[in-house]
């Protein structure tokens, strides 16, 4: 393996580690809250070293904030794409179509996959605390 292959492998491993940390953190923060979740809990669930959080995020607070930034960015992009699709229709979109597109996309995280439901649980936990 040459050095470029080594670099790509490390980059791939780094992406996997970041993803595992985020997924583990999201699940645990949703269940236990920020204060109830220890770095060790996250890294054990992600099967990574506790140093990985410091390396990739700095600390638990930064990981928590990155999780919110990532999920909220995904939600915003989804809503914008849905509205762009409706707006790009050859005919002038009706108010009904616009409201339907927006509201369906707004409700989707409540009905969608487990990850979206975990984030909604985390989101409401944060709002309540």
Where do the PLM segments sit?
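Regular secondary-structure segments
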Residues: 26, 107, 124-128
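Helix-turn-helix
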Residues: 28-67
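N-terminal intrinsically disordered/low-complexity leader segments
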Residues: 1-16
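Short alpha-helical functional segments enriched in proximate histidine and acidic residues
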Residues: 28, 74, 109
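An amphipathic alpha-helix adjacent to DNA-recognition modules
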Residues: 15-23, 35, 56-84, 100
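Hydrophobic alpha-helical connector segments
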Residues: 81-116
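Amphipathic alpha-helical segments used for helix-helix packing
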Residues: 112-129
